[in-house]
Swiss-Prot record:
Protein name as catalogued: Serine/threonine-protein kinase CBK1
Region annotation Disordered: where it falls in the sequence: 1-211, 470-497
Annotated Polar residues bias: 20-56, 91-120
Keyword Phosphoprotein: yes
Reactions catalysed: L-seryl-[protein] + ATP = O-phospho-L-seryl-[protein] + ADP + H(+); L-threonyl-[protein] + ATP = O-phospho-L-threonyl-[protein] + ADP + H(+)
A GO MF term: protein serine/threonine kinase activity
Organism of this sequence: Kluyveromyces lactis (strain ATCC 8585 / CBS 2359 / DSM 70799 / NBRC 1267 / NRRL Y-1140 / WM37)
EC code(s) of this entry: 2.7.11.1
Enzyme kind, highest EC tier: transferase
Family matches, as Pfam families: Pkinase
Record-annotated Protein kinase domain positions: 303-631
Family designation: Belongs to the protein kinase superfamily. STE Ser/Thr protein kinase family. COT1 subfamily.
Amino acid sequence: MYGGYSNQNYYQQPSGRPNDFQQQGNMPFSEPSQPMFSTNYMKQQGSQPSLQDRLTQQQSQPQSHNNQYYPNGGFTDVPNLNYPATPPPTQSIYSHNNNSNSKVYQSAQHTSPGQYSVASESGLYIPPPLQQQQNGQQSPVRSVHQQTQQTPPTFTQQQSSSQPQSPQHNTYHAQQQQQQQQQQQQTQQAQQQGQRQTQQQSQQQAQQQNGSANNYMYFERRPDLLTKTTQDKAAAVKLKIENFYQSSVGYAIERNQRRLELESELASQDWSEERKNRQLASLGKKESQFLRLRRTRLSLDDFNSVKVIGKGAFGEVRLVQKKDTGKIYAMKTLLKSEMYNKDQLAHVKAERDVLAGSDSPWVVSLYYSFQDSQYLYLIMEFLPGGDLMTMLIRWQIFTEDVTRFYMAECILAIEVIHKLGFIHRDIKPDNILIDIRGHIKLSDFGLSTGFHKTHDSSYYKKLLQEDEAKKQQQQQQQQQQLNLQKPQLPNETNNGNRNTMLVDAIHLTMTNRQQMQTWRKSRRLMAYSTVGTPDYIAPEIFLYQGYGQECDWWSLGAIMYECLIGWPPFCSETPQETYRKIMNFEQTLQFPDDIHISYEAEDLIRRLLTHSENRLGRHGGADEIKAHPFFSGVDWNTIRQVEAPYIPKLSSVTDTRFFPTDELENVPDSPAMAQAARQREQMMTQQQGVPQSNAKEDLPFIGYTYSRFDYLTRKNAL
């Protein structure tokens, strides 16, 4: 039993029963995954070389069976059968049926007949399906049946056919034939599907050549062929869609954040489950009310006007009362046409974003914002204490303790604006408001700017596609401002001593102090004009060069100087003269001899009113200014809970004694505001409703509407 195998058939089992290879009949050969006998075992028999060794020797020699891809094929002792060790590059067709019998039919490129194979999931190479050419000629690809007939039988097949076959062999052979039939059916289905795809492709190519193919439509963007009105409408629709989804996502994020904050707060409280559930239910009710509010469109008819409390270059501020709730607000009205004509679109958007994005006690709260065809409306909280300019007019000069209090609060307010990513650029006593408890809040962000694209004027210029003539005109105006001649001032060095002011400045006499008081009152009228006042603007802003948040610290130094000295550091009779003094601040910044201030106060002012690269707060921000010795002893965390130096006393919620309402009666409306008012009144008289605005002018104001969530629970709402 363990003798040599030299006299036996290598494919004949010792029992005389046909082996598995003989039972496969006409099935093609497959390369065995493992050798039939161990090499060491064969060497131990001491007989002639084993089949494995013979095959290894034959595979190492080049074969010449007219097979250019298979020089080292396997089983070369069997004629006309070559199985490559490495298959050539193939093209695959995937076939799948409901019985999960999947195959990939692979065909080698540029091969001769008989070299096509089918790769099954089991790794066997099976002959490919029969493919017929469309012209009726026989394809070089042969079917399994054809290949079996054309291939001459091997000596193993002849030997197996001469031997008697057992019933078990017949059953196994029948199963193999059934599998072959199934494979032939699958290949025929794949062939038919490939023929149908080929016919469809040929038909499509023919239709395209005849010019009758209309399966594809080619579009070209040609907005120049459309009218300007159509382009504006398309741009408006695009912005509305973007704003809708942006606001919806933002509201969902805020709603989820409010829920998480309340749950975190309730988890830290030792309350009963019933009380916690009531708090959650109350939040859900508020969310529902706010959702209805967002769907409600506010208008001017929802408010009753009480009186005018402020006027500006582009609008006015009124004291109003909401009809349904009776609460008092300050309504700021801006004329759309002036915003558009005076290139204030970016500033308007920045102001709205600052007020809407801030929930700080140092910034005026915005409750609603809406618009109509002519105006933009900002509904803000009403601060009955007036502004810092009113206090300066009444008290003339502050002590250092009072100045320290208000400057410390201004630092905290400016810090909040900077953390939001904005630059105010217009900090002055007029924009520092006093609340009912005497603490300050920043307002009027009409000149503020941020890092968002909608806060840049170039965004709106591109959006509105301004003509080149207007751009050139603006560039010429800017160039003229840069070419202003600087004043010929004497070359005086400032070694830190307090020198008297220059000859062309205001003299420090009692008579001139009375003139300064007159200047203060006229200063209010200057704020109402379109020119404005440059007393608190940093020099780098005038140069139209790059500047950062440090420009707001210059304004803080100018306000501090005015609180301690009694007038701004560079005040003059005309804005042009003020501009020249600011540009030469090294020579024009002087401290009077008859007014005593501490060394710390003067040092802080000088370190704020200096070049931007050396200015205090440029590198360390607000913390750098807080660390100055002038603010020694200030508790920055509880300063808003400290009693203010001055608390306004009011007789009613509509008391406006701290606002210059008497002066406003003598201030005429701007021509644009007067014309818009006449146009609105005329349209209302004719019962034609509010006049319709130009779609182009409405384009930059998409997304201006806003509603605050906690408008019902704000404690500072009157």
